[in-house]
């Protein structure tokens, strides 16, 4: 399975944890983590939320392939087992984590699924790490590995 995570961030304070789960995931499939942060996004974020969200969408559009999932606090809450079922038997998964202003509603609606990891607003760096852990957990569930007890 091909797993793609597209995100927007300047730095990664959770890099050690992200690397740990990336390595574990590689036992089950191919993982690509792509940071699309660029100068246009940096400038747009200094203007306003509307321009920032537009710049995020422009950066993400070329990567919409496979089964596409937006990470969104207004998305659907799933248990780890439900998440494992959702991603099971997919050839390619693409996850989109918005920047500081989130994602435009129109972009979210254009994807296959909207996933909420929490009703709380979370730092996007933390969301990526949490998502990696849940992807690994889902692979373990789907492969009867004892990580998920």
Swiss-Prot record:
Enzyme superclass (EC): transferase
User: Which compartments is it annotated to reside in?
Assistant: Cytoplasm
Entry keyword Hydrolase: no
Entry's EC annotation: 2.1.1.177
* Function, in words: Specifically methylates the pseudouridine at position 1915 (m3Psi1915) in 23S rRNA.
Keyword S-adenosyl-L-methionine recorded? yes
Know the name of this protein? Ribosomal RNA large subunit methyltransferase H
Question: CDD domains under this entry?
Answer: RlmH-like (cd18081)
The positions annotated for binding S-adenosyl-L-methionine are: 71, 98, 117-122
Task: Give the Gene Ontology MF terms in alphabetical order.
Answer: rRNA (pseudouridine-N3-)-methyltransferase activity
Alphabetical keyword list: Cytoplasm, Methyltransferase, rRNA processing, S-adenosyl-L-methionine, Transferase
Family statement drawn from the similarity comment of this UniProt entry: Belongs to the RNA methyltransferase RlmH family.
Summarize the subunit comment: Homodimer.
Could you tell me which SUPFAM superfamilies the record lists for this protein?
Answer: alpha/beta knot (SSF75217)
Q: List the disulfide bonds.
A: none
- Cellular component, GO, one term: cytoplasm
Its recorded reaction(s) are:
pseudouridine(1915) in 23S rRNA + S-adenosyl-L-methionine = N(3)-methylpseudouridine(1915) in 23S rRNA + S-adenosyl-L-homocysteine + H(+)
């Amino acid at each position: 399975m091909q797993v793609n995570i597209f995100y927007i961030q300047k730095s990664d304070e959770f890099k050690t944890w992200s690397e740990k789960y990336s390595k574990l995931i590689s036992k089950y499939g191919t993982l690509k983590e792509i940071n699309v942060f660029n100068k246009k996004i940096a400038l747009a974020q200094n203007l306003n939320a509307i321009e920032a969200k537009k710049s995020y969408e422009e950066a993400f559009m070329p990567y919409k392939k496979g089964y596409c999932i937006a990470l969104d606090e207004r998305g659907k809450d799933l248990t780890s087992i439900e998440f494992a079922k959702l991603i099971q038997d997919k050839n390619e998964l693409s996850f989109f984590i918005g920047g500081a202003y989130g994602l435009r509603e129109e972009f979210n609606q254009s994807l296959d699924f909207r996933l909420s990891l929490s009703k709380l607003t979370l730092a996007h760096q933390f969301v990526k790490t949490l998502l990696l852990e849940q992807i690994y957990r889902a692979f373990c569930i789907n492969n009867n590995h004892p990580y998920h007890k």
